């Protein structure tokens, strides 16, 4: 942890979803990409081989469609339809969602909430999909708002939007901290100029995350709570 950094001292916290709050033990979101592309464009396209961890749904779609030979102009024109279809697909299959909470995440969120902290989701998921995951995991009531992919595409844009929303509620001087599980979360937080806590509950190890110099790095929420102020 950076010397002098009190991880729970910020006014608001932006939490990534996948790998930070929960890990999905289902393929609903995964198949929604393929099925939505097939429905809208009539082509078979897989997300296999496309980096997904730390990416955004729009970023993943763009990479898949570029690989299939589409130009950005064509992608941009069809994205709204594909996004709508993806959300509808996950909505239809919401009962199959099987999120597994990361260690001590409820206790961590409650620790912050009882101290009056404003909590937000800040995720590369499409908004409908992100909220459905949190709802199925039982976490939805803990978050005041969220910032998601589409029309935003870059993770830094998603974080900046979340910061803006937090400061609209709390005032322009409100302090905000990001909590995530990937190097992309760390890098995006640096771009927007806020502290970042990395938790190694996704695919990246503690050492891999620590190499990107977050303000604090922990193996899981249990360890984070041990350093609560």
Predicted regions and their residues:
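Metal-dependent phosphoesterase signature
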Residues: 65-111, 115
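Helix-loop "lid/cap" segments that line or gate small-molecule binding pockets
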Residues: 58-73, 133, 162-165
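Acidic, Mg2+-coordinating phosphoryl-transfer loop and its flanking beta/alpha structural elements
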Residues: 178-219
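Substrate-recognition element of Asp-dependent hydrolases with the DxDx(T/V) motif
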Residues: 20, 105-135, 148-153
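A short, structured active-site edge motif that brings together acidic residues
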Residues: 48-49, 53, 76-80, 140-154
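Active-site neighborhood of HAD-like aspartate-dependent phosphohydrolases
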Residues: 2-53, 59
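Conserved Lys-Pro-Asp/Glu-containing loop-to-beta segment of HAD-superfamily phosphomonoesterases
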Residues: 156-187
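Conserved H-loop
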Residues: 71, 140-144, 215
């Amino acid at each position: 942890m950076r010397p002098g950094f009190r991880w729970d001292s910020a006014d608001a916290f932006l939490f990534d979803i996948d790998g930070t709050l929960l890990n999905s033990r289902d393929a609903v979101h995964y198949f929604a990409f393929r099925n939505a592309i097939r429905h809208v464009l009539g082509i078979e396209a897989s997300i296999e081989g496309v980096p997904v961890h730390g990416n955004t749904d729009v970023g993943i779609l763009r990479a898949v469609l570029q690989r299939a030979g589409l130009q950005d102009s064509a992608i941009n024109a069809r994205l709204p339809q594909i996004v709508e279809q993806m959300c509808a697909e996950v909505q239809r299959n919401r009962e199959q969602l099987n999120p597994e909470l990361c260690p001590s995440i409820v206790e961590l969120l409650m620790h912050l909430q009882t101290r009056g902290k404003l909590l937000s989701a800040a995720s590369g998921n499409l908004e409908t999909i992100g909220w459905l995951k949190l709802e199925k995991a039982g976490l939805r009531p803990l978050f005041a708002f969220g910032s998601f992919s589409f029309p935003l595409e870059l993770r830094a844009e998603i974080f900046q939007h979340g910061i803006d929303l937090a400061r609209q509620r709390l005032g322009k001087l409100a302090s905000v901290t990001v909590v995530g599980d990937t190097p992309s979360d760390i890098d995006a937080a640096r771009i927007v100029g806020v502290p970042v806590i990395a938790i190694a509950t996704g695919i990246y190890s503690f050492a891999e995350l620590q190499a990107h110099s977050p303000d604090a790095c922990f193996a899981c929420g249990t360890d984070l709570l041990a350093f609560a102020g």
